[in-house]
Amino acid sequence: MNTENKEITSNWFTNLRDLLCKEFEKIEEKYAQIKGLKPAKFVRTSWKRNGGGCGIMSLMKGEVFEKVGVNISTVFGEFSQEFRSEILGAELDGKFFATGISVVAHLKSPLIPAMHFNTRYIETSKNWFGGGGDLTPFYPEENETAKFHTAFKEACDKYDSSYYPKFKKQCDEYFYLRHRKEPRGVGGIFYDYLNSGNFEQDFAFTKDIGKALLSVYPEIVRSKLFLPWTAEQKEYQLIRRGRYVEFNLLYDRGTKFGLMTDGNVEAILMSLPPVVKFN
């Protein structure tokens, strides 16, 4: 396993965490200032993994972001015997290293889309990058969806013109609730097992995906910061959030990976909305 690669990827995810938290706090500060409220701040909680590694949860509950989490982790060790066959390159000795960032935002306003994003670097006897970002609006708007997709398409096109259509398709297929026969949101991109043979290029691409999120999602939130919404719209948001819960508990690979590697349960389930209704 390459020590330098592990260090620089882990450092980037920490840096991206800081940039995102700063941007989200600025949005809370602006809203609080105009409304005469005390702005919310991120609260950080560190955790250690028994088998090796650690992580930091950054969680904020405010007036704009009902719940937003920005988690980073770096873990290592050996996969359990039954899990090795499910992970690329882990079949022989089960050794692994994984570092990454996971971001989930649930907004108070039902007019502002929820957002999920993660990027990661994993080493076994193989090594690869994975991740992506997707948008879940409760009241979809074509221009907003196009803006989100364009940000990721531009990042993809810098490296390979085939990336965006391929990763968009993978996102649409992945974030699909098979038992309901419906998509979770309006998509984005999703990629896994990315290893072109050029580590520097794959890492640069993964960094640009993070920068794309940083450029587009805060802009979407700000554009709807002060739009009025109704109790009926809020009720609909709470019911649709149930789909988010269903997906994360039934299908999400990150949830399964975290639980199977003895990760921090609170960090793993950070993605769940704070309030949900099931009819």
From Swiss-Prot:
Name recorded for this polypeptide: Oxygen-dependent coproporphyrinogen-III oxidase
Keyword flag ATP-binding: no
Cited PROSITE patterns: COPROGEN_OXIDASE (PS01021)
Record-level Gene Ontology MF annotations: coproporphyrinogen oxidase activity; metal ion binding; protein homodimerization activity
Cofactor dependence: a divalent metal cation
GO CC annotations on file: cytoplasm
Enzyme class: oxidoreductase
HAMAP family attached to this UniProt entry: Coprogen_oxidas (MF_00333)
UniProt keyword list: Cytoplasm, Heme biosynthesis, Metal-binding, Oxidoreductase, Porphyrin biosynthesis
Oligomeric and partner information: Homodimer.
Site (Important for dimerization): H179
Stated family: Belongs to the aerobic coproporphyrinogen-III oxidase family.
Ranges where the record places region Important for dimerization: 244-279
Location of the protein in the cell: Cytoplasm
Domain of life: Bacteria
Residues noted as binding a divalent metal cation in the record, renumbered to the chain: H106, H116, H149, H179
EC nos: 1.3.3.3
An individual GO BP term: protoporphyrinogen IX biosynthetic process
Gene expressing this chain: hemF
Catalytic reactions on record: coproporphyrinogen III + O2 + 2 H(+) = protoporphyrinogen IX + 2 CO2 + 2 H2O
Binding site for substrate: S102, N118, T119, R120
InterPro entries registered for this protein in UniProt: Coprogen_oxidase_aer, Coprogen_oxidase_aer_sf, Coprogen_oxidase_CS
Pathway(s): Porphyrin-containing compound metabolism; protoporphyrin-IX biosynthesis; protoporphyrinogen-IX from coproporphyrinogen-III (O2 route): step 1/1
Job of this protein: Involved in the heme biosynthesis. Catalyzes the aerobic oxidative decarboxylation of propionate groups of rings A and B of coproporphyrinogen-III to yield the vinyl groups in protoporphyrinogen-IX.
